Amino acid sequence: MSMPLQRGISGVRVSDSSDDLRDSQMKDKTERARSTENNNLTLRFPFGFLFSNQSSSKHGGGGENGFSADPYSARSRHRLMLLFLKISLVLIVVIALAGSFWWTISISTSSRGHVYHNYRRLQEQLVSDLWDIGEISLGPNRWKELEYCNIESENFVPCFNVSENLALGYSNGDENDRFCGPGSKQECLELPPVKYRVPLRWPTGKDIIWHSNVKITAQEVVSSGSITKRMMMMEDDQISFRSASPMSDEVEDYSHQIAEMIGIKKDNFIEAGVRTILDIGCGYGSFGAHLLSKQILTMCIANYEASGSQVQLTLERGLPAMIGSFISKQLPYPSLSFDMLHCLRCGIDWDQKDGLLLVEIDRVLKPGGYFVWTSPLTNPRNKDHLKRWNFVHDFAESICWTLLNQQDETVVWKKTINTKCYSSRKPGVGPSVCTKGHDVESPYYRPLQMCIGGTRSRRWIPIEGRTRWPSRSNMNKTELSLYGLHPEVLGEDAENWKITVREYWSLLSPLIFSDHPKRPGDEDPSPPYNMLRNVLDMNAQFGGLNSALLEARKSVWVMNVVPTAGPNHLPMILDRGFVGVLHNWCEPFPTYPRTYDLVHADNLLSLQTSQPRKTCLLIDIFTEIDRLLRPEGWVIIRDTAQLVEKARETITQLKWEARVIEVESSSEQRLLICQKPFTKRQSI
């Protein structure tokens, strides 16, 4: 019976005899000794395996059964190869690190800028690709033209759904506040009313608007009660605000009265340090319209109204306005924003909520600023009115307001200029000063705070101590230091915007949309100075566009919007004597449809795409722009070439005319000039 072969190191058969066993054991010892010796050789001569073939031939060739007797076996060569690779990798890493270190310390300032620039381009590409993923996820609907909204939404404003808020249990005025839920996003295009007409140009449009452009009934016109509302008259298809009527004289007399109560001649409010006024419940803007001739800029805010809206009519006249309610939330303005707050029968019950509403207007009022209140409550004729008046009077005193004057139904208070007033009050009198954690300079619709804000700000400067308008718009070195800026920065920004505005204005022509587009030349007529009136700057930065338009004597006012996604320059913009607001562009803007003649976005797309968390798509932003834009209104987008191209592709869904134009001063940026068509709804 044959036994199975057993192979050892030499591969020989193991015999059953004892002699063979002893021989085998002796051979094993010899082989182990030889193996140990070979390993030692391997360590001393690690590259010896490269010459294993020559060595084996030198020592007598192959072993039994075809297995080599070479001391450098296959396993040894494998181990040595791995060792060699490890050493090589270590050397490569060391050389790479040394080279990188040498390159880092030897790189010049210009090359560092070049590398940073390339890094930014790679970062922008990555973010753009991520945005693309979100757009592609829309599937076949990505390039589909949006449908038009139904007729019921002609004047719809997202986030202000009073009936829905009432159903959710909001009451006591809270139902008028702003609530942006998941259903706030609008996915259709607003059509103008059937009889809509392009507004008359400024200044004619200040006094005459088309009745069909706004939602108001004849009864609402007749029943208008306050001074500023009584100026309105219905004439055929027009609503007239007669500047030469007796009612206009009444507004002028009212303005003179306030000036006298403050202690200035006529209504030269600039002399008292007043440039910007927040007009709460502004009627239809006649107070602000009158003050424009005095270089006073008035921002109107009022609750959302489904019909007869004060904000809608004021904007239609070409005057600054926005929907704003502070029943439960703080206004989207920084602390210390306005020189004066005005309330002419504005419908706010200042004695409610234990004075919380008065605390909010104190927050946005600058030191030394004025609060003007005209109401029957100030001249009480019964116990209830007396009780409510006494509360407001005493509360105003407790927050360090001084009662300057009272005539008829009008009262004027002046805010303290000294923060020590708050610490000198008796214990328990008035609300306390906000702690550092609660004193947010620029809140964004935060709940109302029962504490006095702004006292820690470096911007606590009395209005009398500020530079008078119009010099205020060009801040000096000391003023700019409050915002961490140097005069050279603002000066360079101003020069760039002067050039940019000249270029923008020349491009607002149908010539660029022709079959053979060209830049309008010197021989082409320039667009008139009053071609635009209401301008929205979606990323205002320092307010440079606003300043350049005024310097170029264009008849515009600008709503300067500072996105919540970027640096907050809104305090500086307001301190320059402009108006503006904080806003998140992934949410609807608080205004009515068909508000603006021009919407401008400088590097807004770059700002939005750089956010780590995307809450909206590009089409969402452009759909909102379409809602805000008047028929035949213009859009100017300035951004990187890649993002401008994505924007151009997106707006095909909006049915706009569009043209991409190169920027002469920058090879990496492009302009996208668009115009919204005047598409009419078919009459039913």
Swiss-Prot record:
Residue spans crossing the bilayer: 87-107
Membrane topology category: Single-pass type II membrane protein
Keyword entries, A-Z: Cell adhesion, Cell wall biogenesis/degradation, Glycoprotein, Golgi apparatus, Membrane, Methyltransferase, Signal-anchor, Transferase, Transmembrane, Transmembrane helix
Tissue expression pattern: Ubiquitous.
Pfam family, one: Methyltransf_29
Ranges of the Lumenal topological domain: 108-684
Disordered: annotated span: 1-35
Gene Ontology biological process terms, A to Z: cell adhesion; homogalacturonan biosynthetic process; methylation; response to cytokinin; root development; shoot system development
Glycosylation sites: N161, N476
Superkingdom of the source species: Eukaryota
Cytoplasmic topology ranges: 1-86
Ranges of biased composition (kind: Basic and acidic residues): 19-35
Enzyme class: transferase
Known function: May be involved in the synthesis of homogalacturonan. Required for normal cell adhesion and plant development.
Family statement drawn from the similarity comment of this UniProt entry: Belongs to the methyltransferase superfamily.
Protein name per Swiss-Prot or TrEMBL: Probable pectin methyltransferase QUA2
Lineage, uppermost ranks: Eukaryota, Viridiplantae, Streptophyta, Embryophyta, Tracheophyta
